[in-house]
Amino acid sequence: MKSHIQSLLEQTIESFKQQGILPADFEARIQVDRTKDKSHGDLATNLAMMLTKVAGKNPRELAQLIIDTLPASAFVAKVEIAGPGFINFFINDSALADQLQNAVNDEHLGIKLPTPQTVVVDYSSPNLAKEMHVGHLRSTIIGDSVVRALEFLGHKVIRQNHVGDWGTQFGMLLAYMEELRAKNGEQAHLELSDLETFYRAAKLRFDESAEFATRARQLVVELQSGDEYCNKLWREFNDISLSHCHEVYARLGVSLTRADVHGESAYNADLEQVVKDLDAQGLLTESNGAKVVFQEAFRNKEGEPLPVIIQKADGGYLYATSDLAAMRYRSNVLKADRVLYFVDLRQALHFQQVFSLAKLAKFVREDMSLEHLGFGTMNGEDGRPFKTRSGGVVKLVDLLEEANVRALELVRSKNPDMDEETLAEIARVVGISAVKYADLSKNRTSDYIFSFEQMLSFEGNTAPYLLYAYTRVAGIFKRVTGLDLSQAKIVLEHEKEKDLGNKLAQFGEILNRVVDKGQPHVLCAYLYELAGAFSSFYEACPVLAADNDEQKNSRLLLSQLTARTLQKGLNLLGIETLERM
């Protein structure tokens, strides 16, 4: 509906250009918003006020001219001017009912699909030296929800799990594994539960033993040179680490697979060429023995230029080098239209610099969009980064296990007679969903306080509330036998039917915001509002006890569409639904 009004306004702008009211080369930014007060219609635009200067007319006069020039539309019941020049659109109830009717049998719920693009999404990307911790949660689940929405809207999505599987720390890890093998024989292997212990022990040896540190650096050189022995150990370590990651992904219900792993090591052979190409373009400068690039736009508070370090004085490469190689690969090989990076906001300057450099060096096509979709931190109730009571990093598996235990207690307290198998399954879904939804429902760029008590509440904008709301809607159909709605028509008569219908019709524009801005919290807010709209509708409009079959079937269709929208919306967030709670 919103896109339809935008289209009408675009046609009006073109007419104004032809009439000479606006310059022929003028490009208008058309904004259409939902009204908060229904007495002001369903949709509104401030276009007249935006055009008043260039058109040389006062806003209300221009608003009337826009209304007079608008193409006729069956969707629009009436158009009014409000205040200094706002234009309010009242949508025709029968047109809204027709739109909802079309959604009933459509797998995309009546959403008009955009022109498909190839979108590379870089998310999760843990270092393979340690177990995944809570710091990996946000990138993993925010990225995954946006990926799901992109695919649902018909885009070709290429997931890229840019794991940290290369670099100097691997020499340290390989050297320590070599020592363990020497002591315990070839049968010695690293258990998943020992990853953290192993890493700390290797780091301790590296810091305390000069001989060990020398061997670690030697192994890095041998690894980078393709030494078969080093590569064998390196692959084994990565396999163990990746197995752990994918156990966490499976538990989280995240769609990443082994095939999506394209880590730093994948670009190792390209790094030397990156340096050569930057040098050939005259972009490299030597600074304290390192090879760097200075860009005029990036300076510190003192006005001094900030470098992008491409190669260290000892010949080693940095994140910027592999990021540039990855961008070139994603442009030239993957042919991406957009590349989305779900990485901590604290890396904002890094991405601004490498995005700018990639375009400057022509490593990527000019029309390829590079987007850093950063996020804030997850904090404890003291407002500081989330830690264990002893001050250590919280492992992601431990967090999810505690969520499961707490959810089991909650579900058991509400269903004391339920069998253990069913309780366990419901608790699994509720626990994981609560953790994911609590994160996804917050604005991506904000820090937030992690609270089990809040996220497991059945009140407010939480996963348990929405899971219950879905079971309540779906439960209506369990009380009906022999239902045939194939000939049923949606009719919007009661005000609460219209409110629910209007909310259902917004699903497409909400998903477009999710994929355009990388903002799953917008979808969370929408689903919460949809559940509320259905609750108001259900209280005011009897469904199974409606006055007649036509009204009953219409309300059943609205209920069915609500259930499908809630389920699809939750699934796009990576959240399973339940048939009972």
Curated annotation (Swiss-Prot):
Keyword Protein biosynthesis: yes
Subcellular localization: Cytoplasm
InterPro entries: aa-tRNA-synth_I_CS, Arg-tRNA-ligase, Arg-tRNA-synth_N, Arg-tRNA-synth_N_sf, ArgRS_core, DALR_anticod-bd, Rossmann-like_a/b/a_fold, tRNAsynth_Ia_anticodon-bd
Record GO biological process: arginyl-tRNA aminoacylation
Motif extent ('HIGH' region): 126-136
PROSITE patterns cross-referenced by the UniProt entry: AA_TRNA_LIGASE_I
SMART domains: Arg_tRNA_synt_N, DALR_1
Protein family according to the UniProt entry: Belongs to the class-I aminoacyl-tRNA synthetase family.
Name recorded for this polypeptide: Arginine--tRNA ligase
Species assigned in the record: Shewanella sp. (strain W3-18-1)
